[in-house]
Amino acid sequence: MVSRDFGREKRLLIPRQFKAVFDSPTAKVPGKHVLLLARPNALDHPRLGLVIGKKSVKLSVGRNRLKRLIRESFRLNQDSLAGWDIVVVARKGLGELENTEVTQQFGKLWKRLARSRPQTAVEAAGSSHA
């Protein structure tokens, strides 16, 4: 089981990591006012990057609220997301949703992304012998 913390190792931190996901996402999960881009990583845990610009959400209070909600939702659902580098791209209107709506929407988005989860090396090796 993946630990439920959200430490530095579970974040996309440098531009090169974001660029890798933007340049070649293997999964795109659109939602209401948001887009998830994901790419497999070779790690046993997922990593999250957030792109919430001023064009999408004008006030910093709103941007920070969304970041907190998205990070918390990710933290609670990360066991099913192992093996992904994920970038969340906010679109206009996301800041106008209530906290419960944002939380529910991301719960559904994580589930949709988990269904298209890449096989780990262990799973791939096991299925080739069957």
From Swiss-Prot:
The record, for InterPro entries, names:
Ribosomal_Su5_D2-typ_SF (IPR020568), Ribsml_uS5_D2-typ_fold_subgr (IPR014721), RNase_P (IPR000100)
GO MF terms held by the record: 3'-tRNA processing endoribonuclease activity; ribonuclease P activity; tRNA binding
What are the EC numbers?
A: 3.1.26.5
Domain of life from the UniProt record: Bacteria
- State whether it acts alone or in a complex, and with which partners, per the record: Consists of a catalytic RNA component (M1 or rnpB) and a protein subunit.
Q: Which NCBIfam families match?
A: rnpA
Under what name is this protein listed? Ribonuclease P protein component
Species the sequence originates in: Azotobacter vinelandii (strain DJ / ATCC BAA-1303)
Please state the gene responsible for encoding this protein. rnpA
